[in-house]
């Protein structure tokens, strides 16, 4: 079995449990206005919220504060909070309750978080607990960490609803709580760190595909899994763009994290329509498989979307694809540790730390392609200049 095939098989097993950042930055809310992300008569996604959509559309146009060379330190429209009551003299013990490492995005993230902690001499100890993508285990982990003398608690929740009460109990101990990646429905954490969100991701990629395919162009929407809120939000935003630009979405199909199925879907649509003018994907898992399906049909690869996975970036460069890669940046794992150091030093932090959401284009592709890294290494880690790179991230 090839290295990529083995990796893909592993991912297919776990993606149903833990998508890379598998919830959006805010807990899902349902819009009741009757407006929706689609043509008249198309049912509205239960995850769609007009206000959240409008906010993210605006945020992606706002220049973040801070140095663009360190995007993990940048922030969009921050409201700073005082942290002086959390000042801790001497060496620190940080604790991290992780939802799990069930996919390569999270593996890259955890490696990056640990490397960031090593950069701060004030951090004497870092305790990491893996919930194995199980709510019950993470709830128990959080209770156990409250007995470990943690000076700050970082949490990447497994799910929103189940973990909210456990995080509220952690906040009540007086230890500062930092939540990142996935949100909870309480504002008790000192800060909540996340990129802009799924609507921005979907709109960025759909605008590119609509521009390249043109009005009336035939576009196949390749979905990963149903009923995952961030993926639903990505598709909802894309549907808005496609409807507005007059794109003909000839099909919306789920590959269910199955690469052969993704190839079969493409082959079937090529037989039906003869030519596809673009493929929009709500996640980059199947982007390489989609390109390979066009190769098998002896057709040029049309404009398509991907993410910052090395296999896709390498194919993009090699074949000079017409592509774009919106991202869910891994560098937020760095921000979580940095926020903890700020809080324990008494430095203000944003109540909601919104990070910029990198878009990889042909012009910036070479900045993110890292030769020699594993196929599913995610290059938005901001880790390329950290001590131990590339060895610590290569899995060797």
Regions flagged by a language model, labelled:
Residues 21-31:
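Bacterial lipoprotein signal-peptidase II cleavage site
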Residues 31-92, 333-396:
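Hinge/cleft segment of the Venus flytrap/periplasmic-binding protein
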Residues 34-87, 92-112, 116, 120, ...:
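Extracytoplasmic "Venus flytrap"
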Residues 78-81, 126-149, 252-272, 287-289:
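Structural motif
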Residues 80-81, 138, 193-219, 233, ...:
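Hydrophobic alpha-helical segments within soluble ligand-binding/sensing domains
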Residues 94-95, 113-115, 203-253, 340-343, ...:
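An alpha-beta-alpha
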Residues 155-170, 238, 250, 255-315:
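Hydrophobic alpha-helical
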């Amino acid at each position: 079995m090839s290295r990529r095939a083995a990796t893909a098989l592993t991912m297919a097993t776990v993606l149903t449990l833990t998508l890379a950042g598998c919830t959006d930055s805010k807990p899902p809310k349902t819009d009741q206005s009757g407006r929706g992300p689609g043509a008249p008569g198309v049912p509205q996604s239960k995850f769609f919220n007009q206000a959240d959509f409008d906010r993210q559309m605006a945020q992606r146009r706002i220049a973040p504060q801070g140095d663009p060379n360190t995007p993990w330190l940048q922030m969009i429209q921050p409201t700073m909070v005082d942290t002086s009551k959390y000042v801790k003299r001497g060496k620190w013990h940080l604790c991290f309750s992780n939802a799990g490492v069930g996919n390569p995005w999270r593996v890259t993230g955890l490696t990056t978080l640990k490397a960031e902690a090593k950069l701060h001499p004030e951090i004497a100890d870092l305790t990491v607990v893996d919930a194995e993508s199980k709510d019950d285990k993470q709830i128990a982990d959080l209770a156990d960490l409250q007995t470990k003398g943690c000076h700050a608690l970082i949490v990447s929740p497994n799910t929103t609803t189940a973990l909210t009460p456990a995080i509220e109990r952690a906040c009540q101990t007086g230890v500062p709580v930092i939540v990142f990646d996935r949100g909870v429905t309480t504002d008790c954490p000192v800060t909540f760190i996340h990129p802009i969100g799924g609507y921005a991701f979907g709109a960025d990629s759909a605008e590119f595909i609509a521009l390249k395919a043109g009005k009336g162009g035939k576009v196949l929407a390749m979905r990963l899994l149903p009923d995952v809120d961030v993926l639903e939000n990505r598709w909802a935003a894309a549907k808005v763009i496609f409807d507005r630009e007059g794109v003909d979405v000839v099909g919306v199909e789920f590959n269910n994290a199955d690469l052969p199925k993704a190839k079969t879907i493409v082959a079937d649509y090529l037989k039906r329509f003869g030519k596809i003018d673009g493929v929009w994907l709500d996640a980059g898992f199947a982007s390489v498989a989609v390109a390979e399906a066009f190769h098998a049909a002896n057709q040029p690869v049309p404009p398509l979307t991907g993410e910052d996975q090395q296999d896709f970036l390498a194919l993009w460069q090699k074949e000079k694809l017409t592509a774009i890669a919106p991202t869910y940046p891994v560098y937020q794992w760095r921000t979580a540790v940095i926020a903890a150091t700020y809080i324990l030093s008494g430095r203000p932090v944003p109540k909601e730390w919104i990070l910029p959401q990198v878009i990889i284009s042909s012009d910036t592709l070479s900045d993110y392609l890292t030769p020699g890294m594993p196929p599913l290494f995610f290059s938005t880690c901001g880790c390329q200049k950290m001590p131990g790179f590339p060895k610590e991230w290569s899995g060797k």
